[in-house]
């Protein structure tokens, strides 16, 4: 028998442990500080003490993390390029994304996952390139191994992804581990899913040795795939993200809708439904879609109907320079002409009587 109190009990732990997140700075801002690691460590407000200690103790790792911010934010913007919210970052905002990620939404889940993955990727790459004193190539990949093609020798430089994951967990999760509220648990879950996603795409690369390429001896190593593979994977997880509530003892999650499966460690989880992101809203941090380019012939999320939220669009006639008449010349060049191409660009209208700032 289903009790009417059952729903109350499901939500009670969430209500008891929920606190509205505050707009605070994050390690995400490290990519904007520049300068030395000391400048970075001392000028990113919001770092907890253990993060600052790691920052001062490992300046070379912090440089890698700071450079990596540009990579994972660019990947986020690529994945959301055809959506109303396009993972836009805010200049001079210490939180990098503003208020939009205060909501425990699918978008927050994705950003926490992709940022955590980005840290693993950046640190691991820096280790392999000899840019970090405390790590190098994977020391476990030594001696011989065997695969479907036979025996091989471990050689080259296998990416030390275990070090990247370990450091990322210690640094990225530090602030969330200090909190016991629902949002902290959500962030920790999505951080872990992001870290695991990078390791999923480790690939074995080999080089043949022998007379005339006979491959009588193979040397192999493990290498991370391009970060786009991780971005594409997390994008699929975003589209299949699972809405959850806190369980009764407040230590984990249960699905909000019993028809859906329980989330695994690889799934992204969220608590709140997303806003529609149609209009500029200071409360939610949405910049709206006025001025966004839309696709008149598309039926997807980038269509003018969906992107512009039914407000209509303006059309501009523009010209652009393109390469044309390209010919191959022996040997070995391709020569092209410069041509002008005329095209129509469609941009979403702003809401009527709105105090509007066109998003960038």
UniProtKB/Swiss-Prot annotation:
Signal peptide from the UniProt entry: 1-25
Major location (coarse): secreted
GO biological process, one term: canonical Wnt signaling pathway
Keywords recorded for this protein, A-Z: Developmental protein, Disulfide bond, Extracellular matrix, Glycoprotein, Lipoprotein, Secreted, Signal, Wnt signaling pathway
A matching Pfam family: wnt
Subcellular location(s) of the protein: Secreted, Extracellular space, Extracellular matrix
Bridged cysteine pairs (disulfide): 76-87, 127-135, 137-157, 206-220, 208-215, 278-309, 294-304, 308-348, 324-339, 326-336, 331-332
CDD domains xrefs: Wnt_Wnt2
PTM annotation, UniProt: Palmitoleoylation is required for efficient binding to frizzled receptors. Depalmitoleoylation leads to Wnt signaling pathway inhibition.
UniProt cross-references to Gene3D superfamilies, sorted A to Z: 3.30.2460.20
Positions where lipid (O-palmitoleoyl serine) attaches: 212
Gene Ontology MF term list: cytokine activity; frizzled binding
Cellular component terms (Gene Ontology): extracellular space
Residues bearing glycans: 295
Family: Belongs to the Wnt family.
Role of this protein: Ligand for members of the frizzled family of seven transmembrane receptors. Probable developmental protein. May be a signaling molecule which affects the development of discrete regions of tissues. Is likely to signal over only few cell diameters.
Protein name: Protein Wnt-2
């Amino acid at each position: 028998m289903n009790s009417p109190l059952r729903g109350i009990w499901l939500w009670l732990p969430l209500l008891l442990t929920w606190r509205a997140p505050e707009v605070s700075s994050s390690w995400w801002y490290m990519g904007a500080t520049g300068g030395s690691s000391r400048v970075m460590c001392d000028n990113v407000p919001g770092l907890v003490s253990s993060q600052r200690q790691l920052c001062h103790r490992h300046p070379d790792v912090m440089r890698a993390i700071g450079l990596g911010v540009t990579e994972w934010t660019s990947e986020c913007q690529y994945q959301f390029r055809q959506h109303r919210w396009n993972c836009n970052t805010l200049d001079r905002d210490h939180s990098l994304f503003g208020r939009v990620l205060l909501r425990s939404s699918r978008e927050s889940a994705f950003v926490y996952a992709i940022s955590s993955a980005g840290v693993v990727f950046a640190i691991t790459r820096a280790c392999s390139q000899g840019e970090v004193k405390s790590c190098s190539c994977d020391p476990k990949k030594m001696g011989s191994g065997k695969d479907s093609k036979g025996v091989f020798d471990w050689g080259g430089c296998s990416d030390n992804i275990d070090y990247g994951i370990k450091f990322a967990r210690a640094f990225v999760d530090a602030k969330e581990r200090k909190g016991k509220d629902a949002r902290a648990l959500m962030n920790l879950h999505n951080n872990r899913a992001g870290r695991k996603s990078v390791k999923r795409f480790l690939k074995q690369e080999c080089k043949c040795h022998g007379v005339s390429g006979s491959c009588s001896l193979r040397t192999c190593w493990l290498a991370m795939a391009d970060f786009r593979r991780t971005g594409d994977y997390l994008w699929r997880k975003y589209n299949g993200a699972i809405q959850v509530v806190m369980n009764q003892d407040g230590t984990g999650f249960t699905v909000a809708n019993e028809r859906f499966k329980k989330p695994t460690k690889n799934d992204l989880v969220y608590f709140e439904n997303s806003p529609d992101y149609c209009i500029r809203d200071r409360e939610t941090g949405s910049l709206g879609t006025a001025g966004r380019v839309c696709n008149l012939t598309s039926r997807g999320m980038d269509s003018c109907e969906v992107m512009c939220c039914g407000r209509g669009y303006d059309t501009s006639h523009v010209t652009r320079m393109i390469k044309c008449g390209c010919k191959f010349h022996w040997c070995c060049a391709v020569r092209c002409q410069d041509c002008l191409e005329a095209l129509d660009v469609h941009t979403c209208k702003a809401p009527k009587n709105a105090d509007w700032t066109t998003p960038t």
